[in-house]
Amino acid sequence: LRILDAINQNFPDMQYITSYARADSITRKNPAELKALRQAGLNHLYSGMETGSDQILKLINKGFDADTVVRSGCMAKDADMILSEFILLGIGGKELSEENAAQTAKALNIIQPDFIRVHATGIKPESKLGEFVRDGSFTLQSEEEIVIEQKLFLQQLHEMDSYYVNEHIVNLLLEVRGNLRTEKQEMLSTIDRFLALPTNEKLLFTVGRRLNIFFLLDDLKKPELHQEAEKNLQQILSKNPDVDFAALCNYVRQSQI
């Protein structure tokens, strides 16, 4: 409260004050304390729930369970705060992909945050998950498999007044964004457009996105960009015909976070 008072005194025209907040930090407050923070000007919380799966939360050593995620989100909303929940696609690997989609959607359907901010996972080699990748207990998903996970996740989200957004460069389909109540089907249609591409075009778009040649699916229709992406793909294949594109794309994603 002292920090908020100082902000208000020095910036009297401030309209939004935002803070990052762990789920277990929120639940350590009681409802009256959260409302006092809101009345003092803290009106937007960014919370990195990552997933609604207890199994995955334990795997990544997050430090709290799915019940804490749900309780914290509901507490923030009850305090009349704007709530952004950050989730990670691919954080369970191939083994827990469906679990991640289903349980994360289940939690968010209860919370009904104002924003659902979607990030594709980039696993750093020195991390614990990187160790799991090396020992074979965690299997990296291809970009297409992460998109399929996103489709499963989006399908299971209710049509609520939450804004769904792929806003970070690590995401493959940046145009998948919109209000879940009014634009959910449009977002699913964009995902289906990608999944319906011929195999070679899906790979080309994936490589082009990771090299920042393409940004939107429609960029595939631009001859100069298509040619540039094709040239780069052939260079990759000429140097390593057996390249593991799941590992290569993960390497690029983890370098961007």
Explain the meaning of each model-derived region.
Residues 19, 47, 85, 108, ...:
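Conserved, mostly hydrophobic/aromatic
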Residues 29-34, 92-110, 150:
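Catalytic cores of alpha/beta
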Residues 1-78:
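Conserved SAM/AdoMet-binding glycine-rich loop
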Residues 10-12, 40, 75-83, 111, ...:
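A structural motif corresponding to the C-terminal end of an alpha-helix
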Residues 2, 60-68, 96-103, 137-145, ...:
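Alpha-helix N-cap and loop-to-helix initiation/capping positions
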Residues 24, 48, 52-56, 75-100, ...:
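Conserved strand-turn element in the central/C-terminal portion of the radical SAM core barrel
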Residues 29-30, 58, 95-96, 128-130, ...:
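Short, well-ordered secondary-structure micro-motifs
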Residues 109, 115, 123-257:
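Auxiliary Fe-S-binding modules of radical SAM enzymes
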